[in-house]
Structures are given as C-alpha cells and as structure tokens.
Amino acid sequence: MLVYIHVPFCRSRCRYCAFHSLPLGPASPDSSSRVAAYRDSLLRELDLWAARLGRRPVESVFFGGGTPSLLPPDFQAAVLERIDRHFHLAAGAEISMEANPESLLARRAVDAYLAAGINRISMGVQSMDDRFLALLGRPHRRADVLRAVEHLRAAGCRNLGLDLMWGLPGQDTAHWLSTLEDALALEPEHVSAYGLTLEEGTPLERDWSAGRLSLPEDDEQERMYLEGIRLLAAHGLEQYEISNYARPGFFSRHNMGYWTGADYLGLGPAATSTLEGRRWTDTPDQARWQADIDAGRPDHDAEAITPRIRLEERLMLSLRTCAGFGLAEYTTLSGRDFLADHGGWCRELVAAGLARLDGDRLALTPQGLLVSNAVVADLFERLDELGL
C-alpha cells in the first residue's frame, strides 16, 4: 500500500497554482494552533484507518502539498512512527517529501528531516533563472537552490529530485536547455519536467488572457519537450513517464504505484484515496475535514470504481508511462482481445510515429506522449462504440 500525506499549507500561493492550500506564516493568524489541529486530526485519521484496514505493509509514503517542508521535522517523524506502528513500514520503504529550496537553507533543518526518516526529497525548483522565478511568484532564487542542494548532499541525501517547468512566458528552447544544463550540474537522481498549464483564475492566466504575456508557440514547445528528453538522456536520466526522468534505480516508486494501479491511502484535506475498488476525496475545507475525522467517517463520499472506469484508468495511466499498456490487462478487464478491437487503430498510431507495439505492449513514443490526451480520448470513444 502507498500512503499520501497532504500538507495544505503554503507561505504564499504561486502565480500559476490552482491547488488547494492555506496560508501559513508570520502574517497568518493562529498559525501554530492551525498546524497543531491539523497534526492531531491527521494522526486521528491514521488511527481510524488502522482500525478498518488492519496491519499491511506500506512501501511508500509521500508528503505532498502545499509545502510539507514548512512544518517542523517532528511532524514527519510523528506521522511515520504512527504509520509504522499501525501498518508497518516495509524494509527500504521510499519516504518522499516535497520541499521548497528556501525551506532547506539551514543545515540543522536538513539534518532533522533526514533523521525523521525522509530518504527522498522532491525539490520545487521550477526555474534556475531569477527572472522567471519572479514571474512565477516563487519565493526562492537560484542561489537558494544551490545552497539547499549543498546542505542535502552534505547531510547524506542520496535521492534528490528536482521539479522544473518549461513552456514559460517568453521562454524559448535555448533558454529551457540552459535551465536544464544548470539543474543537471547539480547531479540529481530524478528530474520532473512539466509543461506550464495556465489554470483558470490564476494570476498568470489572467495576465495571459489580458494580453500582458504570451506563451511559446506550439512548435516551439514541442522542440522544448523533445530536446529536453535528449539532453536528460545524455546526462544519464531515462524518461519513464511523460514528465519524469531518473537514473537507473531511482524511478519514483510512489508515482509508479499510482501509474500501475496500486492501492493508495490519502490523508489530509483534499487528499484522494483508492482502496479495494473504492475511491474518495477528503474535503478541502480543514474545519470540515476535522469534523469528519471527529465523527469517525473519513471516507463518507466514497464511490465504487466501475469496470469501465477501471479500464479507462488503466489505459490512461499506463499510456502515460514509457513502458506502456500490457494488452493482456485489457482482456482481464474487458474479456475481449485488444488487437481484435483496436488493431487497425494501433497500426495507424505506429505508422504516424506516435506509438510502438512491442509484442504484448503498446507504448507511446515521445511524439505520441506530446498528444497523449488526444490519443486516450480517441481510444475512449472506441470503447463507447464497442459498448464497453
């Protein structure tokens, strides 16, 4: 089982972000009491699930957010101790934490996070150019990234991921590759490289809608993506999903669990869980979430995952990965033969350079991954036509 811990707090909201988060910092009233209430409810939620699920091994824990590194290391230590007590942390479990560079500028804090049990850091770098960091509303600068990485390596962190963004307003391929080179000089074990998505209602989207900034043209963004793949590969980082690259042995086990359909338990406001054929999402409202926990009903909005939804999800998530979709799984989930249903469609994708068919697996090429949403939507329409 995987466990995801959603930490809903941020010092401020970045200009591109539409995720659920709550302000936390010196200017926020009652910060300490809000964190204490959140911690108590989260541990209570763990207790409730332990009573329902019984003891089972946990292969991965991911502290996401929000900004988990805003909370003191004793929070992560307490959560991991409770997970191990109730469920059992498997030997060699991957324990990841998202962190902002400015949260890791004190060596003592870095030491404490690793001592608490964190063995993988996913750092929200986004850009190595201070001009773009300011445009994105990020609270750190390039110098903070360098210092944070220095502290992490000195403290013994041997599994470091850097999160980067491409397709930024005013960016071209040369600038993106320069950013990548700068980040790769830090020798990360993992890189996540995401194309910027303008979320409705965010400050960045409003600026774009008002004509105050422009995004790179589609063909320029395609070059950024494909040239980025080549540069990352030249530095020993293999692409294993649309936006994720790693050195051998450093694929994110947590994310691979999501993409391969593993059960996962999400804890905290706005966290989603999928367990034993059911799915639910906790309310994003912290007060309501705490009331749900106090009432002993953390999954009150659970719904069953139908066979069609299960099939769609396995197709969609598998085709995000470079390993692709195993055709035998289609038979298991639908009772039908994939190539009998979709063989001609597959051959068209292969001929267009968008996919490869290797024995019993269908996988998208880098060019196919660029248009994966359209490919998957087309496949879902075919399922409708078949009455599945």
Give short role names for the model-derived ranges.
Residues 369-388:
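Short, amphipathic alpha-helical interaction segments positioned at domain boundaries
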Residues 351-360:
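A short, conserved structural fragment
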Residues 361-365:
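Minor-groove-contacting beta-hairpin "wing" of winged helix-turn-helix DNA-binding domains
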Residues 4-6:
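Short active-site neighborhood of thiol/selenol oxidoreductases, capturing the structured segment around
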Residues 8-21:
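Local cysteine-cluster metal-coordination motifs and their immediate loop/turn environment
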Residues 1-2, 21-52, 56-336, 386-388:
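C-terminal scaffold of the Radical SAM
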Residues 336-350:
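Short amphipathic alpha-helical interaction segments
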